[in-house]
């Protein structure tokens, strides 16, 4: 299966957040399915944001050695795309042209410049499709592989 999805930080965080059990289960299923089918990537930005959020903002933070093991597990499960100067420049353009925050624009730029057509995120912008990149909220109805699906069950 080819890589066609960039996972945003919130999908990873929900998998480790016990505050909303229904989203946690969905996020775990998404990660499991994407890892098994090798259809998703993350970026170095996503991995860094994940480490920050789960170590500081969860009810039960992940710290120290456990956090390092968790980051390693994610990096082994999903290819990690680096953020480079081209991505930063494209993010600046996206930020200005589409009124996105810089960090959201950088996620978009990473997907766009790596020819990844979908971003799984709960934070879908006003435009759900920007220059070849479709935003999909996997906790609602969404489309993957050109077919409409309900929820996360049919990601493969």
At which residue positions do the language-model features occur?
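Helix-adjacent hinge/juxtasegments
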Residues: 58-81
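Short, structured helix-loop boundary elements
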Residues: 24, 64, 68, 84-85, ...
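Acidic, PIN/NYN-like endoribonuclease modules and their adjacent C-terminal/linker elements
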Residues: 2-4, 108-156
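Active-site neighborhoods of divalent-metal-dependent phosphate/nucleic-acid chemistry enzymes
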Residues: 78-122, 152
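Short, well-structured N-terminal submotif of metal-dependent ribonuclease cores
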Residues: 1-42, 57-65, 145-150, 154-156
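Alpha-helix C-capping/helix-to-loop hinge sites
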Residues: 15, 33-37, 53-57, 74-78, ...
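Short beta-strand segments at enzyme active-site cores
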Residues: 41-44, 121
